């Protein structure tokens, strides 16, 4: 569960309310809370040996590699990382993002059957059941995983550098 570098009140509140469900099904959770809610989330997870709580995960690639399902906001950087990782994803876009770009990002993947979208408004009721359902549906996880990989642009950094150099006079 990743709510971006600052965390997500919505995702944190959903998870705090759903810890028992994950424990019952023996599901391990890696939870990045952000700094603002870290103490409250850490306290809520006390006694849940299946839940590892971090304010920030520096080596997010390791957390992604360990995950069977990823729950995330839908910012551009997160989306690009998730496409490269190729894991099944549930996206809960931040509704106050400029021009609602996170919802647009999420819907591009949803339309390609590459992610599941849950609105921030409905996350409290829908997120935990959707995560549990996806964790228990290997076929759906495989489909989402295969489809999200098609959105990955592995040489994005090189493409950006090439475009920048085109703008600099005298640089080929």
Predicted regions, residues:
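Short alpha-helical segment that forms part of, or immediately flanks, the ligand-binding pocket
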Residues: 61, 79-87, 107
